[in-house]
C-alpha cells in the first residue's frame, strides 16, 4: 500500500506541476503520438468504442459531462492518442482520470524530455514486476513486448512472468529487479538495495521516479482488476498457463 500511495502522490504532484505531455518519440514506437487536436468525430468514435465490463463506462460522447469530454480530448491530444484499459475505467471519475493519465504518461514515456528519467528498459522492468504481482493480464499484455524492444531479454521477461528469479541479469537490471521485488514483497527496501538502485538510476530522482511508476501501475492494475477488463480476442492469458 505504501508503494501505491507514494506513486499516486508523485503522479498527482507531477500533474499539478503541469508536466508537458509531448513524448512523441516513444509514443510513435508504441502506436500513439497524435500531433493535432482530435476532431469531434474522432472523439465520438473513440467513446463509442469503449465498453466497460463491470464498470459502466459511458459510450455516447454527446451524453458525457463537460469534464468527461475534456478528459477524452486531453488523452487523444497526448502521446497515447487512444483510450484503453484503466483510462476507460476512469472515465466515470474524470478528474481522477485526468490527473492519473497525465502522471501515467510521465511514467510510461520515460526517457523522453520532460518525463521520468528512468531508462525505458528499467522502467518497463518495474512495470512488469508490478503487473506480475497483481496478475494484471491487461497491463502485462500492453508492456511485455515493448520491454523486449527497449532492451530486456526475453529470458528476463519470461522469468518475471513465471515468478522465478532471472538466471542472468545485467547489473542495472538486477539492481532494479531487486529493488522492485523487495519493495513489493516487504513494503520496504534495505540500504544496500536502495544504494544499488541509486547507482543504476542515476541518484535520488531516478529512484523516486521509479517508485512513482510502480505506484501508478499498481493503480492501473487495480483499475483493470476492478473492471475485470478482458484481453483482446484471441489473446491467451499470460498467468494461467
What do the predicted segments below correspond to?
Residues 18-29:
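Signal peptide processing junction and immediate N-terminal pro/mature segment
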Residues 198-199, 206, 215, 223-241:
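Acidic, carboxylate-rich catalytic segments that either coordinate divalent cations
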Residues 170-211:
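Acidic/histidine-rich alpha-helical segments that form the ligand environment
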Residues 1-4:
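Positively charged n-region of N-terminal signal peptides that target proteins for export
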Residues 7-18:
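Bacterial N-terminal signal peptides
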Residues 122-160:
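Mid-length scaffold segments of soluble, non-membrane domains
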Residues 117-126, 209:
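Alpha-helical scaffolds flanking conserved acidic
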Residues 27-117, 241:
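Mobile cap/lid helix-loop segments that border enzyme active or cofactor-binding sites
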Amino acid at each position: 500500500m505504501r508503494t501505491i500511495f507514494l506513486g499516486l502522490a508523485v503522479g498527482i504532484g507531477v500533474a499539478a506541476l503541469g508536466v508537458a505531455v509531448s513524448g512523441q518519440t516513444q509514443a510513435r514506437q508504441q502506436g500513439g503520438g497524435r500531433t493535432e487536436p482530435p476532431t469531434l468525430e474522432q472523439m465520438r468514435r473513440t467513446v463509442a468504442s469503449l465498453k466497460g465490463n463491470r464498470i459502466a463506462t459511458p459510450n455516447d460522447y454527446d451524453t458525457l459531462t463537460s469534464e468527461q469530454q475534456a478528459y477524452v480530448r486531453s488523452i487523444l491530444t497526448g502521446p497515447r492518442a487512444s483510450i484503453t484499459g484503466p483510462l476507460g475505467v476512469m472515465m466515470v471519475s474524470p478528474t481522477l482520470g485526468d490527473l492519473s493519465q497525465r502522471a501515467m504518461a510521465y511514467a510510461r514515456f520515460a526517457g523522453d524530455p520532460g518525463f521520468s528519467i528512468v531508462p525505458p528498459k528499467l522502467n518497463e522492468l518495474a512495470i512488469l514486476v508490478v503487473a506480475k504481482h497483481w496478475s494484471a493480464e491487461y497491463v502485462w499484455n500492453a508492456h511485455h513486448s515493448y520491454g523486449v524492444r527497449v532492451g530486456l531479454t526475453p529470458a528476463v521477461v519470461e522469468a518475471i512472468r513465471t515468478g522465478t528469479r532471472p538466471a542472468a541479469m545485467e547489473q542495472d537490471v538486477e539492481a532494479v529487479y531487486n529493488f522492485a521485488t523487495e519493495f513489493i514483497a516487504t513494503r520496504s527496501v534495505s540500504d544496500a538495495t536502495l544504494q544499488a538502485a541509486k547507482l543504476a538510476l542515476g541518484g535520488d530522482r531516478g529512484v523516486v521516479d521509479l517508485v512513482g511508476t510502480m505506484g501508478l501501475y499498481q493503480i492501473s492494475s487495480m483499475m483493470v482488476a476492478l473492471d475485470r477488463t478482458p484481453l483482446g480476442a484471441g489473446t491467451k492469458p499470460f498467468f494461467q498457463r
